């Protein structure tokens, strides 16, 4: 029997699909009892939402073979009272264990995608701990000493560390790298293949060609200044954005008024279009009906140096669509120069997009899709399941 797997991250399950959902849903489909939690609500969250909009009940939804306990405002955490916090964590851990019956006594595995959940381990008491490093956490603007302490403690406690890019090995302490494995982001190739035979979505069909696409979260990691310059230099190119803004339409791109003002100014251009967030199963319908797909990320320190460590989720999904891909020059993506073009600077971007739209891009439809198939999420989870099975067999 497979042990329960308790997974934690700050992103709500019922939101934009990221590697968490792709990984955990596949483990659930393979018979792993999976519970996904964003932790107990905080007093700040309750106040922000308003008590009347918060549920005081503890209830669970099952989605894609994963049990998802929905947030409850009962016993929220507080930064002011450590004793109250301890009680809130203990109650939350007890509720999580009650969601699914245990088939293996004392054999639970905790999988953390974010070090902020390290304190919960003391109350959940799993036998084994997996830490999936999905970001260069210390490079995040505003990273605190408290967060760094949790990050280091979780590295020491983890029995297995997985990293979403090879470059992320560099953010780990040297003495824990021997228990680290590379688990790159993959592609839902079956879903993209299905989308290839479906008609162009109505909102996208209303936009003229050539379409230069971006699918994903629209955050400060996206180089708005670059896109603005390109959109103004090539007025016939139609830039199409498909994805959410952090915090919703009024989220102001993570609280940055400057970034949000730049985004608003970009949208005022006649050849820039934002189609909003879409269900994860429909994203591929937009990717396959572009003329070229892009990863226009900030590669300098304006976004905390994120791109130096990135292996974007959309990379292999773009390749599965079979269309040309132009990307910012990211270290871990450089190995794929034979199927996409990596560039830096407005002139280089303009030249690369011009070539792509003229049919002169690296690779072809077949080679791009072949690489995506070799990097499917199913294959990634094959590797992870092997490692988890090994963990579960340890005393």
Where are these regions (language model features)?
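A short, active-site helix/loop in glycosyltransferases that binds the activated sugar's phosphate group
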Residues: 158-182
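Nucleotide-activated donor-binding/catalytic signature segment of Leloir-type glycosyltransferases, i.e.
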Residues: 243, 253-287
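Nucleotide-sugar-dependent
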Residues: 14-18, 277-320, 326-338
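Membrane-proximal helix-turn-helix segments that form the acceptor-binding/catalytic region
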Residues: 94-101, 105, 144-161
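Conserved donor-binding/catalytic core segment of Leloir-type glycosyltransferases
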Residues: 204-222, 227-231, 239-242
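Carbohydrate-associated surface elements
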Residues: 167, 183-195
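A charged, aromatic-enriched C-terminal amphipathic alpha-helix characteristic of glycosyltransferases
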Residues: 361-391
